[in-house]
Amino acid sequence: MREQFIRTEMLLGAEALARLQNARVALFSLGGVGGYTMEALARSGVGQLDLIDNDTVSLSNLNRQILATYDTVGMRKVDAAKQRVLSINPECIVRTYAVFYTPETAGQFDFTQYDYIVDAIDTVTGKLALVQNAHDAGTPIISCMGTGNKLDASAFEVADITKTSMCPLARVMRRELGKRGIRHLKVVYSKEEALTPTGWEAEAAALGKRQIPGSSAFVPGTAGLILAGEVVRDIAMAAPEA
């Protein structure tokens, strides 16, 4: 065991750490939520990370995304992510896919090869397709609900989607998954009521333009770290296969 994981082994034990180092996790979306999930998984010793995102780093990402610095503006997020992961753990196997995940691109992925899937996607269509594919493959998945227009990082909870409240995205997901015969999904969601858009965003909404949610440095990142914590605990504490 390398020195960098000593503190993790002290907390989890050698067998649990070995399970993390042998695990392969797929992370869909590397934005304000997913970037922090990636960071924590890399620092926790996850041995293989598949990183999926088709976006590039922009100046508007600087307020909340851990991959965004002036040095990375203009880079593909998957490239910035791989560079960062390997700077933390050079032995991690990192696979990158500059793909916008949709039902049409889902065929590029074999979901049975993953030990865990993390959904940090911000489109309902993509989220539904990802959950459906994970469900069909029998692969554990955790999904993040809405983090935009929120300021209370302490309002997040982990729950089955049937137990959520106050989150419009969770409500839509619950309804649409039910139509697909999927009754249960572990999610991270916020019980905080979304704030009302202000300034230019309100004007855009009034004109019928796409509404971009406001965001902070700390709310999406908190959700991302909670996602990572659930993945690490589920993998590390899993019963050994017979």
Task: Describe each model-derived feature in a short phrase.
Residues 1-26:
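N-terminal charged helix/coil linker that caps or initiates catalytic domains
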Residues 2, 21, 109-114, 121-126, ...:
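Glycine-rich phosphate/adenylate-binding loop
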Residues 98-106:
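Conserved SAM/SAH-binding loop
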Residues 42-48, 136-138:
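Conserved S-adenosyl-L-methionine
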Residues 46, 51-89:
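Glycine-rich phosphate-binding loop and adjoining beta1-alpha1-beta2 segment
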Residues 27-29, 52:
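Conserved N-terminal Rossmann-fold NAD(P)-binding element of oxidoreductases
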Residues 33-34:
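Hydrophobic/small residue at the entry helix of a nucleotide-binding pocket
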